[in-house]
C-alpha cells in the first residue's frame, strides 16, 4: 500500500490508516470475487493499487471541494467499482450511486460496500439509458464519472441526464 499512500499524497490528500485498510480489504475482495465473477483482468495486488486505485483517484483533484465534502456522484458502468469506490474511500462524505448492467457485478458491489462499512451508497442494476429516466436518478448528481465505458461522445449522452442542471 506504500505506492498508493505516496500517490494519494501527491494528488493532494493523505490517506488515514482506516482508509488504507479499506483499500486493502477492497483488493482482497476483488481478487476473491474475481475467481467466480469476471470483474477484472488485473489481479496482482501491486497492479490493483496502481492501475485501479491510483488511476481512479486521479479524478480527485478535479472534484470541486463542495462535492468532496458531501456532493452526490454517480458512477456509470461501475463494473468492479472503479472509479466510484476509491473516490468514496478517499472522500467518505460523498453520496455515491453505482450503476452497472450486470447483476453479478452489482451483487459484488453491494457486498463490497457493506464489507467496507460504507454509508450513503446506492447500487443499481440496469443500463444507464433506461435508469436515466428514473425520477430518483434523473438530474440528481453533482458529478457523473465512468471508466472505460464508451467513447466520450456516447458517454456524454449517457451522463447528461443524471447531472443536476447548472
Language model features with spans:
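Short capping/connector residues at structural and topological boundaries
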Residues: 44-47, 53, 90, 133-136, ...
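Conserved SAM-binding loop of SAM-dependent methyltransferases across substrates and taxa
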Residues: 80-93
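Residue-level signal for inorganic ion chemistry
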Residues: 30, 87, 159
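Conserved class I S-adenosyl-L-methionine
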Residues: 68-79
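S-adenosylmethionine
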Residues: 71, 93-97, 101-166
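Class I SAM-dependent transferase core
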Residues: 1-70, 104-107, 111-122
Amino acid at each position: 500500500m506504500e505506492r498508493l499512500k505516496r500517490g494519494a499524497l501527491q494528488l493532494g490528500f493523505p490517506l488515514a490508516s482506516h482508509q488504507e485498510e479499506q483499500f486493502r480489504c477492497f483488493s482482497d475482495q476483488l481478487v476473491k470475487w474475481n475467481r467466480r465473477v469476471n470483474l477484472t483482468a488485473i489481479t496482482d495486488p501491486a497492479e490493483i493499487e496502481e492501475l485501479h486505485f491510483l488511476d481512479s483517484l486521479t479524478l480527485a483533484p478535479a472534484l470541486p471541494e463542495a462535492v468532496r465534502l458531501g456532493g452526490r456522484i454517480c458512477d456509470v458502468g461501475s463494473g468492479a467499482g472503479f472509479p466510484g469506490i476509491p473516490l468514496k474511500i478517499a472522500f467518505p462524505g460523498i453520496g455515491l450511486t453505482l450503476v452497472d448492467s450486470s447483476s453479478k457485478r452489482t451483487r459484488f458491489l453491494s457486498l463490497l460496500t457493506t464489507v467496507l462499512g460504507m454509508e450513503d451508497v446506492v447500487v443499481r442494476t440496469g443500463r444507464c439509458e433506461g435508469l436515466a429516466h428514473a425520477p430518483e436518478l434523473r438530474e440528481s448528481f453533482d458529478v457523473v464519472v465512468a471508466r472505460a465505458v464508451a467513447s466520450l461522445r456516447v458517454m456524454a449522452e449517457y451522463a447528461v441526464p443524471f447531472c443536476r442542471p447548472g
